[in-house]
Swiss-Prot record:
Belongs to the DNA gyrase inhibitor YacG family. NCBIfam families: PRK00418.1. GO terms for molecular function: DNA topoisomerase type II (double strand cut, ATP-hydrolyzing) inhibitor activity; zinc ion binding. Zn(2+) binds at residues 9, 12, 28, 32. Binds 1 zinc ion. This is DNA gyrase inhibitor YacG. Inhibits all the catalytic activities of DNA gyrase by preventing its interaction with DNA. Acts by binding directly to the C-terminal domain of GyrB, which probably disrupts DNA binding by the gyrase. Interacts with GyrB. Keywords: Metal-binding, Zinc. Residues 43-65 are annotated as: Disordered.
Amino acid sequence: MSELLTIECPTCGKTVVWGEISPYRPFCSKRCQLIDLGQWANEEKRIPSQSENSDSDDWSGQPEQ
């Protein structure tokens, strides 16, 4: 008999079973999933990086030669 793995919802902290019975995992609900998506869309969350790329017109995305 295996024990169910549980985690905390990253948005509200509610306990979530990690498995097929939790379709929004790691979130507890669609609401928490959408809250997280909104935070990314509003740039409240970001993936840290070494360089600071700006949105200026002179940034081409190409490495300097």
